[in-house]
Amino acid sequence: MVTIENLHFSYSRHLVFNDVSLSLEGGKIYGLLGQNGVGKTTLLKIISGLLKVSSGSCSVMNYDPAKREPGFLSELFYIPEDFVGPDITINQFAKLRGDFYPSYDANKFSRLMTDFEVNGNYKFTKLSFGQQKKAIIAFALATNTKLILMDEPSNGLDIPSKAQLRRVISQASSDETCIVISTHQVRDLENLIDPIIILDKNGVLLNESIENISRNLCFEFSPVPSESAIYSEPALGGYVVVNRNTSDQECKVNIEALFNTVLLNKEVIKDIFKK
């Protein structure tokens, strides 16, 4: 679906990616994690063709995204973090834009709008940021494109809406669709995203499935900190402790603890997951 090889990208003199290689497959919902400023949004824009690589290559569905060819654009939908809709009704927007996507399903859009409890007869400009966000997510999923990129989709959503978001994305995923979700609110999407990609300054620290992470790392609660642990952090009544998984059993992954473990123990993690 997406193949990135030896990618370099910089803004003027600010290097963002240095020799990055990465592949994304269909049938998965990727969680794209990283501290602010490491390039999560930049990566999504490169994949969607809004930014051109400095060197190296990025191939998406066998297209060069920077060329923005019609066949490419009809199979990709990108939702920016700060989406603001035009001064027309949501239904008008869907009718106008739906024709650009060969697999767009108007009935699916209507169902998703109902699930999100958003009235399509309202103008975007009359809705809250969260309601606008739900409307564009509903439209994106109804396009049935092969690749959907979401930048911080849970921002602006209240707690019930976040539950709705998890449900509709899970139901809309398929073997043919690749969904990439950039987020710093991992608890909102913890049971949805798999595999996990963690970016650091200039590159990719981790790109692994939840299954492989659970086979190699164990996340446990301990009343006291452990000096032998790879990582530990205070929690209510004790500590979350991360160790190598030396058993034959898979451990439930704590994505927030995983993120901190990877950032603070880069060489150890690199050694554990070396191919």
What are these regions (language model features)?
Residues 56-67, 71-72:
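Conserved ABC transporter NBD signature motif
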Residues 2, 17-19:
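Conserved structural motif at the start of ABC-family nucleotide-binding domains
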